[in-house]
């Protein structure tokens, strides 16, 4: 499995996303640039310029019509994915750490930072698509349709459950919350990870009925959207920055490594900078992929399950297309079931 190395950023990666077809990959880093790439061959399609601070997050609407980014310049920007023009800027009092479109693309959530006397919030905007042909995209609302304020512990990550029914948020204190996406009312809060170990990433399954969290407490957990019950726990030996669920095969991919500030001039192996594959059902580690020279900050899996991409503190995105042995790999019990 030879990776394609994408060199488009000068500073560490913060998030990468495939579009829904999986043919494009979007990456954001601390160097203010959003890059678009072809995922098949790693060719750079273009860049989107306009932000004045480190980019923390990116998401792409279901039809790849709009892109949303959140940054340290306290704005969320909406982009025309095709032309690269910025069609809307929403301003906030603090930095924006996570954006995500709802499954139908009609709404966009943004998670804002707790700072300078402002509490962390989750805001939701209604998104309009002009005439559907990519025109009039700049006709957007100015005010959010919903605002959730995190009184206790600030939200670090958030996303939409199946059918956009709930907003699921991961918090700085290691807990996970479920909010009603229409009223903003908190329905449940569960201490999923060790107290005060923040949740760094939260990614959903293909059908959005469950999700995986990655935490500083060196574990990742699969949790049900409906009742926030912890279904599986994957234990690693290093703090985790990111975790993703693979379609097609029952695996999860975890990424992390020693915190960037703790890294000394040791070998890449000692820093534990590998992508780890675990079996989703049996919770065993089944393999690792090396390559990054620094912690892994973000992992995204191709929506068809044919490959994955990882972005690291080293400023590189590595795109991997899975080989035949990956798809052939089975546990004995799975093989027996297939034979029946």
UniProtKB/Swiss-Prot annotation:
SMART domains linked to this entry: WD40
Subcellular location: Cytoplasm
Gene Ontology biological-process entries: formation of cytoplasmic translation initiation complex
Record keywords: Cytoplasm, Initiation factor, Protein biosynthesis, Repeat, WD repeat
WD repeats: 8-47, 50-89, 91-135, 150-189, 194-233, 291-330
GO cellular component: eukaryotic 43S preinitiation complex; eukaryotic 48S preinitiation complex; eukaryotic translation initiation factor 3 complex, eIF3m
Database matches in SUPFAM superfamilies: WD40 repeat-like
GO molecular function, one term: translation initiation factor activity
Assembly notes: Component of the eukaryotic translation initiation factor 3 (eIF-3) complex.
Family, per entry: Belongs to the eIF-3 subunit I family.
Role played: Component of the eukaryotic translation initiation factor 3 (eIF-3) complex, which is involved in protein synthesis of a specialized repertoire of mRNAs and, together with other initiation factors, stimulates binding of mRNA and methionyl-tRNAi to the 40S ribosome. The eIF-3 complex specifically targets and initiates translation of a subset of mRNAs involved in cell proliferation.
PANTHER family assigned to the protein according to its UniProt record, in alphabetical order: EUKARYOTIC TRANSLATION INITIATION FACTOR 3 SUBUNIT I
Record protein name field: Eukaryotic translation initiation factor 3 subunit I
Taxonomic source organism: Coccidioides immitis (strain RS)
């Amino acid at each position: 499995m030879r990776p394609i190395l994408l060199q488009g950023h000068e500073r560490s990666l913060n998030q990468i996303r495939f579009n829904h077809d999986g043919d494009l990959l979007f990456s954001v880093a601390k160097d203010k640039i959003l890059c678009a790439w072809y995922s098949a061959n790693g060719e750079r399609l273009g860049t989107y310029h306009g932000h004045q601070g480190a980019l923390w997050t990116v998401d792409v609407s279901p039809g790849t019509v709009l892109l949303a980014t959140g940054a340290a310049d306290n704005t969320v920007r909406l982009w025309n994915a095709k032309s690269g023009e910025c069609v809307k800027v929403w301003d906030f009092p603090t930095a924006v750490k996570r954006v995500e479109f709802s499954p139908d693309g009609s709404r966009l959530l943004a998670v804002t930072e707790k700072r300078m006397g402002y509490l962390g919030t989750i805001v939701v905007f209604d998104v309009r698509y002009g005439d559907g042909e990519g025109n009039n995209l700049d006709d957007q609302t100015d005010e959010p349709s919903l605002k959730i304020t995190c009184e206790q512990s600030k939200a670090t990550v958030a996303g939409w459950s199946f059918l956009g029914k709930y907003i699921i948020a991961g918090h700085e204190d290691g807990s996970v919350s479920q909010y009603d996406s229409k009223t903003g009312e908190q329905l449940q809060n569960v201490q999923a990870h060790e107290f005060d170990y923040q949740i760094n990433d939260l990614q959903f399954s293909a059908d959005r009925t469950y999700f995986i969290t990655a935490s500083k407490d060196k574990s990742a957990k699969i949790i049900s959207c409906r009742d926030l019950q912890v279904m599986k726990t994957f234990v690693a030996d290093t703090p985790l920055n990111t975790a993703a669920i693979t379609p097609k095969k029952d695996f999860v991919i975890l990424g992390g490594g020693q915190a960037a500030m703790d890294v000394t001039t040791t070998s890449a192996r000692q820093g534990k900078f590998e992508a780890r594959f675990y079996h989703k059902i049996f919770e065993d580690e089944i393999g690792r992929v090396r390559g990054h020279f620094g912690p892994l900050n973000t992992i995204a899996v191709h929506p068809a399950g044919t490959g994955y991409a990882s972005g690291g503190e080293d400023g590189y995105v590595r795109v991997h297309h899975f080989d035949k042995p990956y798809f052939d790999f089975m546990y004995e019990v799975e093989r027996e079931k297939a034979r029946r």
